[in-house]
């Protein structure tokens, strides 16, 4: 494992991975502003020694990009739209989980693109459960769930409504997942009951593994002012955050595959 990714806070043999959640308002963009905000969040997370950075669903273009008159562009490996994020990952030695619209072989996807700490594109998960709304039906659904060994942690990645279905938790569990990362645009209430019920179900169906929910805030387009980012384990919510735009940081024990934090360390953007 790359030693720079971890902090040895309790002496030899206890290596702690710091994970940052960029709980910002992204829903209506514009894309250029969202990109700047993500880069700002990465820089701030680096100041707090965070080595993984999670963003919400469609953080780059904005979840409401199809209902806005603002310009947007889908990311691809050809158009260099990911380049500034790749450079930031290399500069800060971070792994970025980037919620974005992505196009591959002319097929548009609602994706979580993963960029490695060396600044290279690693892989992506495409949202499999695309709801029939204008905000989502532009994207073709993904076909699979994969588990990747990311810095020694077998990690499954899901996008928002993917987390609603217990069978998706079972699929990543079958592949040996030790951690689930969920990027979301999921306000409370919604059309399928409280989101935390789905997240608990996901954790239980994946053998109780920790589940990290990176949600968003803001009121433009969709009211996410009370949307929660959350950490779960063994089918229960450990702690949550809702409110102002903030970078949220937790400690994760890479060896024991356990969440060490009991609450988020919260850095409000307005306080900087």
Please annotate each region the language model reported:
Residues 1-15:
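N-terminal amphipathic/basic-hydrophobic helices that include classical n-h-c signal peptides
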Residues 16-28, 54, 124, 153-162, ...:
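Active-site-proximal beta-strand elements of phosphoester/diester hydrolases
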Residues 22, 125, 148, 214, ...:
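Hydrophobic residues at beta-strand termini and immediately following loops
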Residues 25, 56, 97-101, 182-183, ...:
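A cross-family glycoside hydrolase active-site/sugar-binding cleft signature
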Residues 31, 36, 40-117, 188-209:
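Cys-nucleophile CN-hydrolase/nitrilase-fold catalytic domain and related Cys-dependent amidase chemistry
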Residues 81-95, 164-247:
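CN hydrolase (nitrilase-like) catalytic-core segments centered on the catalytic cysteine
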Residues 100, 111-114, 146, 228-231, ...:
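Short beta-strand scaffold segments in enzyme catalytic cores
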Residues 104-175, 188-201, 254-272:
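Active-site catalytic loop in hydrolytic enzyme cores
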């Amino acid at each position: 494992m790359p030693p720079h990714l971890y902090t040895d806070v309790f002496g030899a043999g206890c290596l702690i991975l710091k994970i940052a959640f960029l709980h910002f308002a992204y829903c209506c963009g514009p894309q250029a502003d969202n990109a700047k905000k993500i880069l700002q969040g990465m820089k701030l997370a680096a100041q707090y020694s965070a080595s993984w950075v999670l963003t919400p669903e469609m953080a780059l273009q904005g979840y409401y990009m199809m209902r806005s008159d603002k310009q947007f562009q889908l990311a691809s490996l050809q158009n260099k739209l990911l380049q500034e994020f790749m450079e930031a990952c290399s500069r800060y030695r971070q792994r970025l989980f980037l919620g974005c619209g992505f196009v591959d072989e002319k097929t548009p996807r609602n994706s979580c693109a993963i960029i490695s700490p060396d600044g290279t594109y690693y892989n992506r998960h495409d949202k499999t459960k695309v709801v029939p709304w204008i905000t989502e039906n532009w994207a073709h659904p993904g076909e699979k769930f994969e588990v990747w060994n990311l810095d020694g942690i077998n990690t499954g990645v899901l996008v928002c409504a993917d987390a609603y279905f217990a069978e998706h938790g079972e699929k990543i569990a079958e592949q040996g997942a030790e951690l689930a990362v969920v990027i979301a645009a999921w306000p409370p209430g919604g059309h399928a009951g409280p989101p935390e019920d789905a997240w608990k179900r996901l954790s239980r169906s994946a053998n109780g593994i920790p589940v990290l929910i990176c949600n968003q805030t803001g009121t433009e387009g969709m009211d996410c002012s009370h949307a929660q980012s959350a950490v779960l384990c063994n089918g229960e919510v450990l702690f949550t955050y809702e409110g102002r735009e903030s970078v949220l940081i937790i400690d994760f024990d890479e060896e024991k595959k356990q969440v060490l934090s009991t609450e988020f360390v919260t850095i409000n953007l307005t306080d900087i």
